[in-house]
Amino acid sequence: MHTVQLLLKTSKYERHEIDRRFHALAHLHNVCVKHARKCMIRLQHDKRYAELRQLYNELVKKEKMSKEEKSQKKKLAKQLAACRTKQGLSKASLEHYLKVCGKQFSKLLSSQQVQAEADRVWCGVERCLFGNGKELHFKKLMDFDTIGGKSNKNGARFDLDAMYVNWLGLSLKCYLPKSENSLSYVWESLKGKISYCNIKRLMFSSGWRYYAEIVVSGDAPTRVSIGTSTMGIDPGVSTIAGV
């Protein structure tokens, strides 16, 4: 997989609409974080989960485990996962929760864009549960720079033939680079299958600039650098020498 980032040509109205969508995304993200934090607090007070976790950790600490202990470890892992799911702490649970919350923003964000944000929150939950994460944090509006996608058939859809991004009523024109070398590289990069399209924003002194981040299957093509030095050619009878 590789990405191609193209600047979007936006009008004042389109910039306003995109900003509304980032506001909606920020709201949904923090709603999901609040819900996940409540679920994690309930899990911390679950005595059954604490007992299972203690037994599981005791087995993990052993350098060598018997077949019975390995079987018990798998059984405990399933029971722990069931406890987390019961408290609403699973990827699918968060996706379902935010899907319901996201219905009020159905004209601003697609179902898969809402789902992608739930997945981001779940990544934070995983760090708290299984990694070195200490707490799930709320985010400020300025912290959001990407509205994610999952397929090119839902949400922000990139049209290669027209070089437009069609997104729930918005048709956003993509700028192509002017230099011949960069332009040929972009076209070469877009030859693979378009997986999905993200909407990104970057802050400049003049304000936000918006980009289409197109995710393409396959490896990125090799960029060929064109030199600027002077080269002399000395043609011979059967060979040509370059200096």
Spans of features found by a protein language model:
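Nucleic-acid substrate recognition interfaces
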Residues: 1-243
